[in-house]
């Protein structure tokens, strides 16, 4: 019970990472949406951006009284992962796998120009497991994204289901890998 009280007092933390191919949409639109969300729910923002946009975002979050950490590069990304409740990212396979492994629920906004739509396919795998949310950049509307964030933050039940499904997915994948390795060893002998 004490842990629950501590957890409730901590600000809901949203991390925004554009990935190696960057994400102008993350810099150009999300900060405005997050400012609106912060009017009804206190949140903390961790935001990766470009050097050219860093000061703008720092000042924006300060002016809107949003607790924040804006950075260009973070040497120890695990430090951030451990403090994050929700991740907003593209759909890179390694990023999504790492978030899955660490059981960090995420919203994926796949890069629409990715080759063979692979970022969408990566995110769709997790969505099919009911362990993430996908937002299509081509149909991105500020109000819809704001509504989604508020729903995620307020509806702890859905959020916890996604988190639990990530945990179950990793448990299943671990046993599948162990079984495949054992079969491989047995077949060699």
PLM features per residue range, with description:
Residues 89, 105-116:
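Short hydrophobic beta-strand element within catalytic cores of glycosyltransferases
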Residues 6, 133, 138-172, 188-189:
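Conserved donor-nucleotide binding/catalytic region of nucleotide-linked donor-dependent transferases
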Residues 31, 142, 146, 175-183:
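Short, amphipathic alpha-helical "lid/cap" segments that border enzyme active or binding sites
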Residues 66, 82-97, 104-105:
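Acidic donor-binding loop of glycosyltransferase active sites
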Residues 77, 95-103, 108, 122:
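Short glycine/serine-rich donor-binding loops of glycosyltransferases
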Residues 73, 93, 111-115, 138-139:
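Short, acidic/turn-prone active-site loops that include or flank metal/cofactor-
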Residues 103, 120-132:
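Acidic, glycine-centered active-site loop in nucleotide-sugar glycosyltransferases
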Residues 5-87, 120-123, 135-145:
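Donor-nucleotide binding loops and adjacent catalytic segments primarily
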